[in-house]
């Protein structure tokens, strides 16, 4: 398997340059609540120019910073923000880094076409992850206030967590308000506005969009986006929604209805539960295990998935 991956890397990535990664062009994560983006989970997200997106919504993905990184990759320069991959490769032994796995999901033809484009060209991504805001009704133990309003409320009400034996626990001291710069309901958010403006074009070219949060079903922006998606048939698009499924009957029925109403290739719903009963409820504060299981069965039986 490793030999097959290294052969693929040499033929489709290293043929362009030793630092090339297709994810920097064809994948994007958009943190719309506070206006940040990245194209891989390893480099830290960077800010989106709010003035640029008013003129060109594609600047949500095609930031000046990201274009400079693409230029470096085309020229065989290894960007510092991608150091995780370089460390893996520098070990030797023909190690396979994440740039291979993150590029391999795209066709060789689409990857080869990237080297023919100007380094500063605006790219329509093929895969996208979007978080509209941090609104969430859970406070899971592995999460933090930057991704959950319930986490933030707990810290505001009870103060920051104490007596950590690590120096990297900053997320457990703050209430996460830094990620909610447009208020509780994310009104008049220029990043959301730009994304919705870009959607007619995206809807015809994206292969996959994943909606995460927070808890998407608790976000007004999520339901607004679902209404807009109905207006643009996307026969090649896969929609994936992350949900804790800790939902009341009205909301879970609404989610099921959406799966039937959208004209898309595929609707997938992702939910997680690491344990059973009380143990699960301890890990995911806010979880009612029986409700979660009931909703899961209902989605499996009734949704178009």
Language model: regions and residue ranges:
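Short, intrinsically disordered, charge-balanced linker/junction segments flanking boundaries
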Residues: 42, 300-305
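Accessory C-terminal segments flanking Radical SAM cores
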Residues: 2-106
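Core AdoMet radical
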Residues: 125-135, 146-190, 203-220, 232-252, ...
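Recognition helices and adjacent regulatory flanks at domain boundaries
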Residues: 92-126, 136-138, 159
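A Trp-anchored, charged/polar loop motif used as the substrate-binding/catalytic surface
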Residues: 63, 67, 109-121, 187-200, ...
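Generic structural signal for well-ordered alpha-helices
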Residues: 196, 226, 252-259, 293-300
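Detector for the c-type heme attachment site
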Residues: 86-90, 143-149
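N-terminal pre-triad scaffold of radical SAM enzymes
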Residues: 22-39, 117-146, 207-210
